[in-house]
């Protein structure tokens, strides 16, 4: 019936035209968003910057050349829906082993040992002042920016201004942007030399601007806190960060140990500290038969089993948790500790291997956590990540139910823990 086709096509065309007009009205163009950005700078940002003490000369000079960086992740431009987030519950949950890829660890250790020789005098002075061993600082430097070799392709002010205007965390980045303006106002670095990651982390230590203001130091004595091109300033700033977070002079980060089968793995965590001598009295011993340092025997020490009985086991000092202040991850702090030991002593990978826990999703672990919570256990946050509270609660539940504690989620527990 061809005579019905023309009105139908006309109606369809009209509908598509309406949708196109509606879409155009709902979603502003890039040019319009750029215009709104400029208005935001003068109307919203400047009053906040002025109140924070930023000079008008600095603000005008810096912000007149700032531009939106549309390449950044997780942007939420005005008039557009927020970016879709992949449900973290669908992320894979597996053994921590891949985090410690041996080829990478060896390469970083080799470079670290060479740099330890090159900067021996500087590192000695930093350790004398702050009490943080050089290998720890080198390990942080290597992990964060590959000893300064990683490219920082972003201008920090562009990144921070873009994120302050149209990201999902506008308030946070507005504060960081104003702190970046404080750094420029203080003449530590020029705006065009303030390079960062895509998240706005600055220089070789990867400090956010707020951390720079609090922890960066001028160690080479040139009058500027330069964490971009000055190695002494970068290393000393990291040392100052650790000290301000509680680093204890004269103590190591921790030791790989063997935990006897009769000693429960569900005793870990910073809230269950004991003198190292008390742990040793249970039969826990250092790998290789080495003695624990005498100065540590009466000092607070914690059990750490990042993969339960499926991987290496440790006794750690409070300095381990200070390393977590840099990045709140057990694996990150272990990476730094192991890399520092490789640089200092030529040691290798952990003695015990990382075991296979099967193939699971974070949603599987989250389900286990939720079940444990219903049974009265404290898992910390039920987020699908196996933190120390989840690990020890699993161990306690296993022991209570006649199972050998492993203190880590695995495929075999999915069916049992209901």
List PLM regions with ranges.
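Bacterial N-terminal signal peptides that target proteins for export
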Residues: 1-11
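Bacterial N-terminal signal peptides
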Residues: 10-20
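An acidic, Gly/Ser/Thr/Pro-rich helix-cap/linker signature
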Residues: 27-127
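Sec-exported extracytoplasmic/periplasmic mature domains
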Residues: 42-59, 64-71, 128-131, 142-146, ...
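Acidic/His-rich structured neighborhood in mature extracellular/periplasmic domains
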Residues: 88-243, 253
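Flexible, glycine-rich surface segments
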Residues: 191, 195-325, 333
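Acidic, Ser/Thr/Pro/Gly-enriched interdomain connector segments
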Residues: 317-329, 338-385
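Short acidic, glycine/serine/threonine-rich helix-capping segments at coil-helix boundaries
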Residues: 360-365, 373-417
């Amino acid at each position: 019936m061809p005579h019905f086709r023309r009105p139908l096509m006309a109606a369809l065309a009209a509908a598509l035209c309406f949708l196109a007009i509606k879409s155009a009205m709902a979603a502003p163009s890039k040019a319009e968003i750029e215009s709104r950005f400029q208005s935001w700078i003068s109307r919203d940002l400047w009053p906040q910057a002025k109140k924070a003490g930023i000079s008008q000369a600095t603000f005008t000079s810096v912000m007149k050349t700032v531009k939106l960086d549309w390449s950044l992740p997780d942007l939420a431009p005005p008039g557009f829906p927020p970016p879709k987030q992949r449900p973290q519950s669908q992320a894979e949950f597996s053994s921590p082993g891949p985090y410690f890829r041996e080829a990478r660890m060896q390469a970083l250790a080799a470079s670290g040992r060479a740099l330890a020789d090159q900067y021996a005098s500087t590192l000695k002075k930093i350790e004398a002042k702050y009490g943080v061993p050089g290998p720890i600082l080198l390990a942080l430097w290597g992990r964060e920016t590959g000893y300064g070799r990683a490219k920082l392709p972003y201008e920090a002010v562009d990144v921070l201004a873009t994120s302050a205007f149209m990201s999902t965390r506008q308030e946070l980045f507005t504060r960081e942007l104003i702190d970046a303006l404080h750094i420029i106002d203080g003449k530590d670095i020029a705006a065009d030399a303030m390079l960062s990651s895509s998240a706005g982390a600055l220089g070789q230590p990867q400090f956010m601007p707020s951390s720079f203001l609090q922890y960066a130091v001028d160690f080479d004595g040139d009058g500027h806190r330069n964490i971009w091109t000055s190695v002494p300033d970068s290393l000393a700033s990291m040392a100052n960060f650790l000290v301000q977070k509680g680093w204890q002079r004269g103590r190591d980060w921790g030791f790989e140990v063997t935990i006897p089968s009769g000693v429960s793995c569900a005793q870990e965590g910073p809230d269950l500290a004991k003198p190292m001598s008390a742990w040793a009295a249970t039969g826990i011993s250092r790998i290789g038969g080495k003695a624990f340092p005498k100065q540590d025997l009466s000092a607070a020490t914690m059990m750490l089993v990042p993969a339960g009985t499926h991987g290496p086991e440790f006794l750690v000092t409070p300095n381990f948790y200070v390393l977590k202040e840099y990045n709140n991850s057990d694996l990150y702090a272990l990476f730094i500790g192991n890399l520092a030991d490789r640089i200092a002593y030529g040691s290798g990978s952990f003695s015990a291997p990382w075991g296979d826990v099967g193939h699971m999703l974070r949603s599987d672990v989250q389900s286990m956590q939720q079940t444990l919570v219903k049974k009265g256990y404290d898992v910390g946050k039920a987020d699908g990540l196996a933190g120390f509270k989840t690990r020890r609660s699993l161990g306690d539940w296993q022991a209570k139910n006649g199972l050998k504690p492993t203190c880590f989620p695995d495929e075999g527990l999915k069916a049992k823990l209901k």
